[in-house]
Amino acid sequence: MLQQAERRIPPFRRRKSTPHEQRLSHHSSNNNNNIDSMSKAIAQYTEDGVHAVFEQSGESGRSFNYSESIRIASESVPEQQITAYLVKIQRGGFIQPFGSMIAVDEPSFRILGYSDNARDMLGITPQSVPSLDDKNDAAFALGPQSVPSLDDKNDAAFALGTDVRALFTHSSALLLEKAFSAREISLMNPIWIHSRTSGKPFYGILHRIDVGIVIDLEPARTEDPALSIAGAVQSQEALVRAISQLQSLPSADVKLLCDTVVESVRELTGYDRVMVYKFHEDEHGEVVSESKRPDLEPYIGLHYPATDIPQASRFLFKQNRVRMIVDCHASAVRVVQDEALVQPLCLVGSTLGAPHGCHAQYMANMGSIASLVMAVIINGNDEEGVGGRSSMRLWGLVVCHHTSARCIPFPLRYACEFLMQAFGLQLNMELQLAAQSLEKRVLRTQTLLCDMLLRDSPTGIVTQSPSIMDLVKCDGAALYFQGNYYPLGVTPTEAQIRDIIEWLLAFHGDSTGLSTDSLGDAGYPGLPRLGMQFVGWQVAYITEKDFLFWFRSHTAKEIKWGGAKLILRTRMMGQRMHPLSSFKAFLEVVKSRSLPWENAEMDAIHSLQLILRDSFKDAEHRNSKAVVDPHVSEQELQGVDELSSVAREMVRLIETATAPIFAVDVDGHVNGWNAKVSELTGLPVEEAMGKSLVHDLVFKESEETVNKLLSREEDKNVETKMRTFGKEHQNKAAFLVVNACSSKHFTNNVVGVCFVGQNVTGQKIVMHKFINIQGDYKAIVHSPNPLIPPIFASDDNTCCLEWNTAMEKLDPSNENVTVGGVDVIGKMLVGEVFGSCCQLKGSDSITKFMIVLHNALGGQDTDKFPFSFLDRHGKYVQTFLTANKRVNMEGQIIGAFCFLQIMSPELQQALKAQRQQEKEFLGRMKELAYICQGVKKPLSGIRFTNSLLEATSLTNEQKQFLETSVACEKQMLKIIRDVDLESIEDGSLELEKGEFLLGNVINAVVSQVILLLRERNLQLIRDIPEEIKTLAVYGDQLRIQQVLSDFLLNIVRYAPSPDGWVEIHVRPRIKQISDGLTLLHAEFRMVCPGEGLPPELIQDMFNNSRWGTQEGLGLSMSRKILKLMNGEVQYIREAERCYFYVLLELPVTRRSSKKC
């Protein structure tokens, strides 16, 4: 519909998903969503590949029905046809006629290809250029040839193999040489160059391709204000105003943000219509904001099929984020290239790429002649990133249309690209806030529902407010509980629900639920009887007989047309490519689908599902919990000693910290004062204690700021001016930038405020002298004194005015870390100094730096802005940037001062180590996810095999073997599904309790070490009472198996070998607590002779924060899981043996209680 890149007609609908593909997978919803999104994109490539349909129809004279093409069933497309389509998209061989292009070999400057109009644009007469038909002419030879003289205009030959520098003036040739040598050539754009023959000026826009460098030449007017420094600054100021307007908008309003950006773009560019076009999760698009001429019909609210903008075009938008069509009726210009090249020249990064015929026809049908399209890029999902970096995602497009031919000069397009980067950053924050807001709302609703479940029966979640309909956006919801039907909103009848339940149990009985936006595609045969108001379903299984339902109607009901309906006109346009026919085609596709269910909604449903399951189980075993729960408080008392030890260690660290740290009580009196604060203020700790922070220790100008912090308003990076004491500090001040946080008692009551600071006194003194023009200006700026921070300054045109000695040598300990000095004076700080000389990390960094600089020129200071760049030697320099305005004697702003605070080597090393750890952690997590996913399939096969064996006639011994195999298989599946160490660490792991035989657990645990025992030639001694094998208890069987097997496996692993032994003792004690409640007090001992486990492994096991080995991690997690089950473990070393001593209490079921 709106894409600027080459577009294709969307002829085919996607393949229907199988029922299995519609199943809900709660444990990997995000990952599955990414895979599903990728699958949709790949599937669309196939659909896009039938690109020749429209082109062939035009060549043959046959009619092409656009709307009908959407409804054609998906067919197999030959791979060659898809490849040809992608090649045509990227290497089409034609450009738009408003400019010309030349492709050049990078090292030799020889021309590899050019557009047919290049001669005319450069003013080179045909007489000076040999004919293309003369194959033998030396001027077209592809080997080495003499380069025409740069001093003789009449020698300017234009042909393949010519030195491109000969076509331009001497100064232009020097600019080209400089640009070719740049590491990031795009930062040099645009280059103002002149034709050597005609003297005409051009914007030279350069980018690298696989065979060399492409030079796009766009004619420039000599009076164009963008060519002057003042004009460039004026464009930058207009851009910064637009960006500042975006940043000043109230948060949590994406619609307002989009409305503002279309108004700003229209004001900057002057197009008749500007739209924000958003891509939805299912790849289709929607116009969500629009600014237009009053007489134009609106497109806001229109939705379009995913194939209206092909995946190849979306990929191109990530590479070249701004694309322009000047006149869709203009004939494209052919590109001539060297026959020795293997494939056509790549025009992906070209500003001149010609649109395909279908897109030109589409624009003509909608009355649009010119267009400008800009990509909106935001952060993608972390797991999609490479090398630990977040991936980037194409969120949508900002699309400009004009009813007549229109050409926007490159500098203005470049400014719009910066605006899109700022828009993307702001949009990313707004989307994160919206996601957090949704999550909080869902959590709040879940909390209220949980409260209902605790106080009332499960039916309260449908009979009271809030209800399950408030949990997710839906048209109706229902609870089917104990054979009764409780509907809410628009719902199917009870008979229809019963029919659905039968179908679910028959075809989806082995899943935890169903999630689909099309019940028909999920395979339900009775959809015609239900109607279109129930096409989207969410089903959560609570038990085998109890279910939760949510319903959504078809998407077409939600889609609204922003202007006149124009139904008759739509019918007339059904066969033409037009927004209305795209809209009609989209409605045809989605009339049997609902809005997709979002990940947050599915997570909320899954959480409620688990809560209800536990609620049902807890209702059955309420008495057991009443007895077991008091032991939690005993464990909390046992942890007091550990907490006290940790507290003492924290106090010691605070007292010896190199950062100033102090604290006050609720009355504002000092009750904590470390050595660093004493050093900075000259006030010993014994004198500081009890003083009032506001009245005794800070200057008057900081009193209001400190009072706010004492009113329990937690804040970061707050500057305070502290008083100093003693002769050495007399009449001086200490400046601290502090983070303030509340200090809380163990009862969670606020008892004071803690301040963690950073000393910025030296920097503040220098800044004060600069801003007030105190002292000797030159002496301070260029002083080699190490106390002087790196400083650079700009004039009001953002050109470099000062660059002090500390800037030239950022790290005194490293003589090689230099970024230049005299040669940066006079250059643009944005683009030339920081961009070309000192490379920044990506275009987003350039945008942020430009905003900081212009804010300072506008009187808005910036403090502690993270600023990193590569120096000339490729060394990564990490700093904090402070930018302040420069004023003259009359108080007028004449520029900006910038101060850099260098991160210490220790901090850099720590950050580097942290990034490396995060990278390794991400790699490990991906490996773990891959292993977990891969293991599930063979486990499923084992489960199936076991189920077949269960159906056969087996001896008692064979049945025992089978039960052990099933228990081990379930234990492994449990571990794989719940790889959540954080929930184990914080004690929130969900236990799945049930009745089981303790003997089965012992058999499963022993079976897991038998092979290792044989391998190490060890004897296993069992001391297990016979009665324990048939004892039925209540608890989490699989977690108990996991814990005991881990302890026993480590004993076997470190028992002396060969001819050693391992012994397992089990000692049960039955306690009668009350009528109907019996507890088993079980003692397990896993024993081996000798020294046993290494001491460092035991340290890992009992260390709460760090571990050094995989075995240590496993033991630590097992200990914590055991603690969650009200158990405990000790490792005891005696003279000749060592062993794990495990205590565990489990409720005995009534069946076993009667036997006892």
Curated annotation (Swiss-Prot):
Residues 646-717, 776-853 form the PAS domain. Residues 253-431 form the GAF domain. One of its GO terms (molecular function) is protein homodimerization activity. InterPro entries: GAF, GAF-like_dom_sf, HATPase_C_sf, His_kinase_dom, HisK_dim/P_dom, PAS, PAS-like_dom_sf, PAS_2. SUPFAM superfamilies: ATPase domain of HSP90 chaperone/DNA topoisomerase II/histidine kinase, GAF domain-like, PYP-like sensor domain (PAS domain). Residues 930-1150 form the Histidine kinase domain. Contains one covalently linked phytochromobilin chromophore. Phytochromobilin binds at residue 358. Keywords: Chromophore, Photoreceptor protein, Phytochrome signaling pathway, Receptor, Sensory transduction, Transcription, Transcription regulation. GO terms for cellular component: nucleus. Belongs to the phytochrome family. Homodimer. Regulatory photoreceptor which exists in two forms that are reversibly interconvertible by light: the Pr form that absorbs maximally in the red region of the spectrum and the Pfr form that absorbs maximally in the far-red region. Photoconversion of Pr to Pfr induces an array of morphogenic responses, whereas reconversion of Pfr to Pr cancels the induction of those responses. Pfr controls the expression of a number of nuclear genes including those encoding the small subunit of ribulose-bisphosphate carboxylase, chlorophyll A/B binding protein, protochlorophyllide reductase, rRNA, etc. This is Phytochrome B. The lineage of its organism: Eukaryota, Viridiplantae, Streptophyta, Embryophyta, Tracheophyta.
